[in-house]
């Protein structure tokens, strides 16, 4: 009887501690509510009435900066008028299952929808598979208030610059639609050496000729806003989360405004 009781107590203890055990750091194991988050949040966003001015927040490179990310969420939840938050890649540091889960546990506390694009660190280990399961397609888009928002994988180095990333034919197809203006989100900017140099000209040409309002990136870990190709297209790079900084982009029919905020 004592042996049976001890066995039951041990099973209860192990069940309560299941989150502490992993069979492998490279495992892929997500709960159903942790899957396909970008599409779920697109559906949430579409249910929110469009205001005269669309205001969205961009952050980058959350990686291992969990405390700073918690503070960011608390800061955003105190504000009004924000439509959504975009995490611009390097969600994780090592592409591990637990890292994806930890970041989502923090960001799901936001009172507005959030979206994430894939970064180069997210393609380490089984990270690419985990990203696909947790967030969905690496290239995705949605329309809100007549504006088009496009998420694009630009992590060319992770596939050996084999010509597959970024997928410019897909991007061209997305830019063929009818919209007021498009905003492109990706992790690696075209002026980084980790962007396929054979695709820089075609990428920048697509933006210049297809009513793109801004190309928005992370990866560099420092904030910048510039016109590097002197073609009228602005390039925004957001700082890494440890810099305790984010960008607020406000858009209406007359202008687009960008501000860096600190918390």
Regions found by a protein language model. Name each.
Residues 61, 89-90, 119-120, 187, ...:
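Active-site glycine-centered loops adjacent to acidic/histidine catalytic or metal-binding residues
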